Swiss-Prot record:
This is AP-5 complex subunit mu. The keyword Transport applies. It is a peripheral membrane protein. The lineage of its organism: Eukaryota, Viridiplantae, Streptophyta, Embryophyta, Tracheophyta. Residues 511-521 have a biased composition (Acidic residues). GO terms for biological process: intracellular protein transport; vesicle-mediated transport. Keywords: Cytoplasmic vesicle, Membrane, Protein transport, Transport. It comes from Arabidopsis thaliana. The keyword Transmembrane does not apply. Belongs to the adaptor complexes medium subunit family. Probably part of the adaptor protein complex 5 (AP-5).
């Protein structure tokens, strides 16, 4: 069997657990049948066949019921049954699942009744299931893991799910296929954003001069059309990517999926999963002009050559997530998820190399690269990257890191209920403490959501910024309207009071409830605890959009954008970027930082936290 990635079948299931699209690949299935016969030639076992769509739907429904949700528990719990994914006791089973094709649990140890490994990816309202080609022996090893009595992988154990999956190269390809289909279904096929300054000819000198005096040059995003293969170098824009509605706003386009399969993986082996490349090839075909030299192999991610003005653009885009508690017993948590986006408008098939600086100061926790990249050497603080760039915008590298410069927004949020329908709150925040030019915060907003209470009155004046109230939220706009913060910090406070509409109390069936309420009032020493307890009886169920708001108040969410550099201290020195064969191509670099789930938990309320063991 080949060591690469081949897909036996894939299914797309909607939120009603119905298969709405499926595709089986007979060429790959023939390989599986041949390998199965070779492995079991002396056992006399019948050859297992791929299940029907109805069998997949029924098996997926049974798994959800048995595992508690679409993804499952991920670890062995009291509800786990022998042979189930959670029985294996590995969190990866939330993403690589198995399906039992029969209703009897006793058949779980028969490999013919189990479909594994299935890469599960959820996007929009759909679940994408991709079944890659694996060795029958690997399937038998997984069945053994499902039936063992001990819990979790033992230290030094040869047979564990992690070691098994590491030896299956098709797992990565299956997830790439699943993510590609998820992006097409949801319409999320827009290429990564690459930002370039308006005056690229001036370059880094202008940026350094303006940054030192607190002036940040404006930047604009580069559009992401795929370069045309015709000699004129005209660019095209993929209508599929730009006109596609977002998740939940359109039906499943089966014709688009069939056309994508016919081009990207016609016989089950992924060739090129870039929808923009495929759209460009269909629009332009392949150009016979300026073919690459015979000694150069044209990679799959660059189906034709670029022709036109040359330049190389890099953008570091980081997302900062934080949980700020302002409590001695719970430490604050800040993490950075970053990626390096690239756009290489270079003729021919050049190699690009550069040293990535800042690895030690960025405290990198995880890192991954685009298939076009090679990492031949690395050091304590430098890592050399060599890549042959594809067309259009692409993500060269993704990483998880610590926030080397510290939290961009520090502070606390307090809200105390003085009665059932009235509360007093206080914000105190410090923006960009320890941050220097060229880092510049373009806007900062703090929102207090109250999805289960309706605001009827509000009073409060912040020391900086403006306030906007809606029926279920209070928004404090600290920075905005063209005002940015660069080269200095800002401390701001916001005290105030807020009043909600009265809760609709439930009718008491008899006097027992009233007596129990009086008893609870006597047992509760803290008046505020009693108010919260009393309010929770009458609060409606929490909305799925706000799963953390289980009380009348819990947290405030911070939104911001920072430009000029990364907060993890990851950087690219444009002078160290080398292009071979050598060309006079300008190299530009930019960075922007946005907020993710940046939460200020109410210091006086309840807050979830993970215990450090």
């Amino acid at each position: 069997m080949p060591s690469g990635c081949s897909i036996r079948a894939l299914w797309i299931i909607n939120n009603q657990d119905t298969v709405v699209f499926s595709r089986r690949f007979p060429v790959v299935e023939k390989q599986w049948c041949s390998a199965y016969k070779t492995e079991n030639e002396n056992t006399g076992l019948d050859l297992p066949r791929l299940p029907t769509d109805q069998q997949i739907s029924d098996s997926f429904t049974r798994r959800k019921r048995r595992e508690g949700s679409t993804r499952g528990y991920g670890i062995r719990v009291a509800q786990s049954t022998k042979g189930s994914d959670s029985w294996v006791d590995d969190p990866i089973t939330r993403h690589i699942i198995s399906l039992c094709l029969t209703e009897e649990d006793d058949d779980d140890d028969d490999e013919r009744n189990i479909l594994w490994p299935i890469a599960l990816h959820t996007k929009a309202l759909y679940s994408i299931l991709v079944l890659p080609l694996v060795e029958p022996k690997e399937m038998k090893d997984y069945v053994k893991l499902c039936r063992r009595s001990d819990c979790g992988p033992a230290v030094g154990e040869d047979l564990s799910l992690s070691s098994l999956l590491l030896n299956i190269s098709s797992i990565t390809g299956a997830f790439m296929v699943a993510h590609a289909f998820g992006d097409i279904i949801s319409g999320d096929t827009v290429e990564p954003e690459v930002v370039v300054s308006v005056s690229p000819s001036v370059g880094g000198l202008f940026d350094s001069l303006t940054g030192s005096i607190g002036i940040s040059s404006r930047a604009k995003p580069v559009a992401a059309p795929v370069a045309s293969s015709n000699p004129s170098g005209a660019a095209i824009t993929g209508a599929t990517a730009s006109d596609a509605p977002k998740a939940g706003s359109r039906l499943l386009d089966r014709d688009l999926l069939r056309n994508f399969i016919a081009t990207a993986m016609p016989f089950g082996t992924p060739l090129d999963l870039s929808l923009s490349n495929i759209s460009a090839m269909k629009a332009n075909g392949f150009s016979s002009a300026d073919p690459p030299p015979q000694e150069l192999k044209q990679p799959a991610w660059k189906p034709y050559l670029y022709k036109g003005k040359q330049r190389l653009l890099f953008t570091i885009h980081e997302t900062v997530s934080a949980a700020m508690y302002d409590r001695d017993e719970i430490p604050d948590n800040v993490s950075v998820a970053g990626q390096i986006n690239c756009r290489a408008e270079l003729e021919g098939l050049p190699d690009v190399s550069f040293p990535l600086a800042g690895l030690s100061t960025a405290h990198i926790e995880a890192i991954s690269f685009h298939p076009c990249a090679q990492v031949p050497a690395h050091g304590i603080d430098k890592q050399n990257i060599v890549f042959q760039p594809p067309l259009g915008n692409f993500v060269l590298m993704r990483y998880q890191a610590g926030c080397g410069l510290g939290p961009p927004v520090k502070g606390f949020y307090q809200l105390s209920m003085v009665s059932e329908d009235e509360g007093a709150f206080l914000f105190k925040v410090h923006l960009m403490e320890g941050y220097k030019a060229p880092l510049s915060m373009e806007f900062c907003t703090i929102t207090m959501p109250f999805p289960r209470r309706r605001i009827v009155a509000f009073d409060g004046t912040p020391s900086a910024g403006t306030v906007l109230t809606t029926e279920h939220s209070v928004e404090w706009r600290i920075l905005g309207s063209g005002r940015s913060l660069s080269g200095k910090s800002l401390e701001a406070t916001f005290p105030g009071t807020i009043k909600f509409s009265p809760l609709q109390s439930r009718r008491k069936g008899d006097g027992d409830d009233e007596e129990s309420e009086d008893e609870s009032a006597e047992n509760v020493v803290n008046v505020e605890d009693f108010l919260v307890q009393k309010m929770n009886k009458d609060l409606p169920a929490a909305e799925l959009e706000e799963p953390f708001c289980w009380q009348a108040y819990d947290y405030a969410k911070v939104s911001f954008k920072i430009v000029g550099a990364s907060v993890s201290r990851m950087s690219i020195d444009t002078k160290s970027v080398n292009i071979y064969p050598t060309t006079k191509s300008p190299v530009e670099f930019s960075a922007q930082v946005t907020s993710g789930d940046y939460i200020l938990w109410n210091t006086l309320g309840k807050a979830p936290s993970a215990a450090v063991v």
